[in-house]
Amino acid sequence: MIKLNQRQQSILKIILEKGRLQSSEVHEELTKRGEDISLVSIKRALSSMAKDGALTSIGLGRNTSYEISTIGRVFTDIAEKGYTGIEPDSRFGLDNYNFNLFPEFPTEIFNENEISDLSIATKEYHQKSRNLSSVLGDKELQRFVIELSWKSSKIEGNTYTLLDTERLIKDEIEAPGHAKDEARMILNHKDAFLFVRENEQEYQAFNLRNLEELHGILIKGLGVNKGIRKGLVGITGSKYKPLDNVFQIREAIESLGEAISRAKTPYDKALLALVGISYIQPLEDGNKRTGRLMANALLLSHGYAPLSYRSVNEDDFKGSILVFYETNSVISFKQIFKEQYIFAAEHYAVK
């Protein structure tokens, strides 16, 4: 992946916010924001960033202007709290689906240091899991399933507590005072994870068939239509409007699948599947939970630790996904993914 210093990040944010700019306009914006830098240095930085693929240059000589590329969007460091704290209609993000996003998506999302941290966690996970007895293995699996089903459902607004979820999965006892759909959602998570664990080889690659298969398990009994949605869908708290054409949605899924197949590591594949499914919103309901389970399916199929999201803050999760919807920046969510992967590798031993 490309390396960007603090000044280059500042330039990316300005062009992401303002659109196509010439070097003098970038210099003016940086000066307004308190940066002391010469126009010559700005021109040098812009030229270097265009060469590295973070920017696209248009025109020649004095007429040269710059706009942000897909790679630049993906790696612009957008602060989740600062961005989502702005009213939706005042934010500078995209309103509509970016057709260039997946065809041009980088093959490497994580830098060398991040890959090193993730690899160390994976090695620890393998060591813990290797010599686990069948009895302990079953207990570990059940603990993971309970915590994943609880937290993934909670992110969706489910009000079951962790103890409620444990009783439901272990003893088949529903919590009093809760809607039946809440219990169904949790049990569907359990069934979906166990299904992908038993059919890992089917999930080494992402495609429409296994997307619809996984979604069908997650929405069983919830009154949600299976398959690609045929109507409009809106995103609460966001001005981003997903595709509303069935044929374009299918093409977007195919494009996402190709991007996932190009991704360098299982970490890259899993993260891209999660944000990609959430971004396309191909399903009538349950897109984000399908994305979370698809990410786990890809990790499991490559022998990596699945994520429970137990320690994630739900608002941070939702906010970071929203940043990706509107700006296509993966930086905020990548940090969540990395933290949750390391947490999972350290706390579970799912064989």
Regions found by a protein language model. Give the residues of each.
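FIC/Doc superfamily catalytic core
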Residues: 1-351
